[in-house]
UniProtKB/Swiss-Prot annotation:
Species this protein is from: Haemophilus influenzae (strain 86-028NP)
Binding site for Zn(2+): H139, H143, E218
Protein name from the UniProt record: Protease HtpX
Bilayer-spanning residue ranges: 4-24, 33-53, 147-167, 190-210
Catalytic residue positions: E140
Length: 283
């Protein structure tokens, strides 16, 4: 979930800044064609900037340390396991990092398959068996091999485009009026207010679509892990999460591999654990 939150937060920040620039400067103009062109440019700018910054931002956010030279048996095992799985999945060896956190957590990120990162928490290494941790690593490797971050960026770019375009087209219609001479005029204040409100509203709807896709790709990554290490290991890893964390203890936690069972599934980046386990058993 962490990589998704970072991606969406960066994307929203860029979208907000660019949206204000559009409104203040009026750069998109009044024509539908002009608005569409600017929506495409600015819509994809937010998602692509988020994509290319994802690896650096994720690593800094957890104060993770990339393993350049293994210093102990655990780090050697991590490097060897990720290397073996990456080779089996047909992708270049990603950077591997460890960060200090009591959460049982792991994530993968990066703009391309050749510039990716797999990070695991000390909480995961301390609370999972080797077989369970191996399944989690395979899950993250599958995210990379599936190109999930790139696909998410493209989807977010399309969603951004529709958010910008629709909010400004509607705002233009609402704020426009004709004077006594029959000339069309537009109230800048009304246009700014309406476009900002609609952008936030459409942004929420867009996030529901983005979260749906995120849940879909989690099922795919689980299946990918099953193909790399066997579905029983992946099921064991998910069951371990159920044992370690009661639903109420997940509230407000920042997790990449886990989910909060109490939240509305519409806004969840990960499917409920029981659904993931059931899907694996049905493979």
């Amino acid at each position: 979930m962490m990589r998704i939150l970072l991606f969406l937060a960066t994307n929203m920040a860029v979208m907000l800044v660019l949206g204000i620039i559009l409104n203040v400067t009026g750069i998109a103009g009044n024509s539908t064609g002009g608005i569409l062109i600017m929506a495409l440019l600015f819509g994809f700018a937010g998602s692509l900037i988020s994509l290319f910054l994802s690896k650096t931002m994720a690593l800094r956010s957890v104060d993770g340390e990339v393993i350049t030279q293994p210093r102990n048996q655990t780090e050697r095992w991590l490097i060897d396991t990720v290397s073996r799985q990456a080779q089996k999945a047909g992708i270049p060896m990603p950077d591997v990092a460890i960060y200090h956190s009591p959460d049982v957590n792991a994530f993968a990120t990066g703009a391309t398959k050749s510039n990716s990162l797999v990070a695991v928490s000390t909480g995961l290494l301390n609370n999972m068996t080797e077989a369970e941790a191996e399944a989690v690593l395979a899950h993250e490797i599958s995210h990379i091999s599936n190109g999930d971050m790139v696909t998410m960026a493209l989807l977010q770019g399309v969603l951004n485009t529709f958010v910008i375009f629709l909010s400004r087209v509607i705002a233009t219609a609402v704020a426009s009026s004709r004077n006594n001479n029959g000339e069309e005029t537009r109230s800048s204040g009304i246009y700014f207010l309406v476009s900002m409100v609609l952008e936030m509203l459409f942004g929420v709807l867009a996030s529901i679509i983005a979260m749906w896709f995120s849940r879909y790709r989690e099922f795919r990554a689980d299946a990918g892990s099953a193909s790399l290490v066997g579905k029983e290991k992946m099921i064991m890893a998910l069951q371990r999460l159920q044992q370690l964390h009661e639903p109420q203890n997940l509230e407000g936690s920042l997790n990449a591999f886990m989910i909060n069972g109490k939240r509305s599934e519409l806004f969840m980046s990960h499917p409920p654990l029981e659904k993931r386990i059931e899907a694996l058993r049905n493979l």
